[in-house]
Curated annotation (Swiss-Prot):
Saposin-B is a homodimer. Prosaposin exists as a roughly half-half mixture of monomers and disulfide-linked dimers. Monomeric prosaposin interacts (via C-terminus) with sortilin/SORT1, the interaction is required for targeting to lysosomes. Interacts with GRN; facilitates lysosomal delivery of progranulin from the extracellular space and the biosynthetic pathway. It comes from the Eukaryota. Keywords: Disulfide bond, Glycoprotein, Lysosome, Repeat, Secreted, Signal. The gene is Psap. GO terms for cellular component: aggresome; cytoplasm; extracellular region; extracellular space; late endosome; lysosome; membrane; mitochondrion. Glycans are attached at residues 80, 214, 334, 459. Its main location: other. This is Prosaposin. It comes from Mus musculus. It is found in: Lysosome.
């Protein structure tokens, strides 16, 4: 409401100013566009908007007030206020003017030219200076500079502002003359005032706090500097804003870099504080102790290097054993060969990726020939070792070079557990352990289960375990977090089923197949155990492997 009152007062003042020869409209833009009243009387409103009023304006108090009032009037129009309501409010505000003649003139202007003014406000909301130029409250910047140059030409006196600009470069070089910069920085610098040093440290500390706690501080700081540029006067303010736009990004980067630096150090570099001669050395703490303090639930690696099998081979082994067990169940039920392959394909679909893909590869490669092998009641786990997807038993190494009956006999024997060689003692590994290659999840599985074991109570429900799984990865160090998220996304259903019963890291991770056996014995070189992909290459290999009938029925048909 106060803005409208001020707006009406400015209208009265502007539109009652005299115009040279108002009866004629042949005086050019200087006369036509002097104010809105003359432009309306001569029908030159559009011409003045395009050619005169849209030009940059000089800075002045009436112009700034007018721009503010025009902006407020535009906001009032956005609030869906009708023209009659605005007219009524403006007429009421005209009555508040103490000068009776100005009050009457205000009402006359409001009644006569309000529609034209409101149309201009609606059309030029982004440039309120155009409306204020029409009201003769803002002066063209070009006209203002021309008047200043004319005044300077009419007088022989050198303006004071020019003298200051001439002297400024010489004054700025005086500190360099008094304190040459060629000396090494190790020499003591002039003592700075303690009060100035304290003020600098407080300012830097406040800025650092604002940068850390207020995300909009940087943009607000730049906007505040631009507002200060407006106080420098016409011409110079535009140059100031140009410098701000050009160098503000560099200043922001410096502020972000200094947010973790000590205020005293920054003020020393700026010359407001005395240079610190000595800085006490921080006490070094072993990395293992630092990590334990940050993550109490995270245990370090064992003091010896584990020779782990890649998780890629573990997935193949677990998939093969799953397929073989399903195959045995189907054979017991006297299923046909077509149903066997179809049933195995359906079983593969139940596995998570990438085990699903590997399972389909096993079925596609060995499925048609598995029936012949299972006739001899071969152990599924042993067969997976023969075809190279699981660790082979020692007694199979020699048998693989023998004919097929010898291979079957070796497969039917009970497996004997291999002796584990003693682990050589080595120095402790560093605290930072990179993730395994090929997407291995063994280490991250152990650390995640260990975290759950330390932070969950016994007999925890599935919901509690699931909640702990979803946030547990965020407590691991950075090298493990992404790998942990992938691990949980892939093994979450299987993990839940096992963790409800037991939370031993070694058992759980071995149970789901991400931590394989540390040793894998080499297989023999007998190619006939490679399966149909080798048997059915040609008639010669099929005959040598006694698989001619199989290749004719399943591959060559």
């Amino acid at each position: 409401m106060y803005a409208l009152a001020l707006f009406a007062s400015l209208l009265a003042t502007a539109l009652t100013s005299p115009v040279q020869d108002p009866k004629t409209c042949s005086g050019g833009s200087a006369v036509l566009c002097r104010d809105v009243k003359t432009a309306v009387d001569c029908g030159a409103v559009k011409h003045c908007q395009q050619m005169v009023w849209s030009k940059p304006t000089a800075k002045s108090l009436p112009c700034d007030i007018c721009k503010t009032v025009v902006t407020e009037a535009g906001n009032l129009l956005k609030d869906n206020a009708t023209q009659e309501e605005i007219l009524h409010y403006l007429e009421k505000t005209c009555e508040w003017i103490h000068d009776s003649s100005l009050s009457a003139s205000c009402k006359e202007v409001v009644d006569s030219y309000l529609p034209v003014i409101l149309d201009m406000i609606k059309g030029e909301m982004s440039n309120p200076g155009e409306v204020c130029s029409a009201l003769n409250l803002c002066q063209s910047l070009q006209e203002y500079l021309a008047e200043q140059n004319q005044k300077q030409l009419e007088s022989n006196k050198i303006p004071e502002v020019d003298m200051a600009r001439v002297v400024a470069p010489f004054m700025s070089n005086i500190p360099l003359l008094l304190y040459p910069q060629d000396h090494p920085r190790s020499q003591p610098q002039p003592k700075a005032n303690e009060d100035v040093c304290q003020d600098c440290m407080k300012l830097v500390s406040d800025v650092q706090t604002a940068v850390k706690t207020n995300s909009s501080f940087i943009q607000g700081f730049v906007d505040h500097v631009k507002e200060d540029c407006d106080r420098l006067g016409p011409g110079v303010s535009d140059i100031c804003k140009n410098y701000v736009d050009q160098y503000s990004e560099v200043c922001v980067q410096m502020l972000m870099h200094m947010q973790d630096q000590q205020p005293k150090e920054i003020c020393v570099l700026a010359g407001f504080c005395n240079e610190v001669k000595r800085v006490p050395m921080k006490t070094l703490v072993p990395a293992t102790e630092t990590i334990k303090n940050i993550l109490p639930a995270l245990e370090m690696m064992d003091p010896y290097e584990q020779n782990l099998v890649q998780a890629h081979n573990v997935i193949l082994c677990q998939t093969c054993q799953f397929v073989m067990n399903k195959f045995s169940e189907l054979i017991v039920n006297n299923a046909t060969e077509e149903l066997l392959v179809k049933g195995l394909s359906n079983a593969c679909a139940l596995l998570p990726d990438p085990a699903r893909t590997k399972c389909q590869e096993v079925v596609g490669t060995f499925g048609p020939s598995l029936l012949d092998i299972f006739i001899h009641e071969v152990n599924p786990s042993s067969l997976c070792g023969v075809i190279g997807l699981c660790a082979a038993r020692p007694e199979l190494v020699e048998a693989l070079e023998q004919p097929a009956p010898a291979i079957v006999s070796a497969l039917l024997k009970e497996p004997t557990p291999p002796k584990q060689p003693a682990q050589p003692k080595q120095s402790a590994l560093p605290a930072h352990v990179p993730p395994q290659k090929n997407g291995g999840f063994c280490e991250v599985c152990k650390k995640l289960v260990l975290y759950l074991e330390h932070n969950l109570e016994k007999n925890s429900t599935k919901e509690e375990i699931l909640a702990a799984l979803e946030k547990g990865c965020s407590f691991l160090p950075d090298p493990y977090q992404k790998q942990c998220d992938d691990f949980v996304a892939e093994y979450e259903p299987l993990l839940l089923e096992i963790l409800v019963e037991v939370m031993d890291p070694g058992f759980v991770c071995s149970k789901i197949g991400v931590c394989p056996s540390a040793y894998k014995l080499l297989l023999g070189t007998e190619k006939c155990v490679w399966g149909p992909s080798y048997w059915c290459q040609n008639m010669e290999t099929a005959a040598r492997c006694n698989a001619v009938d199989h290749c004719k029925r399943h591959v060559w048909n």
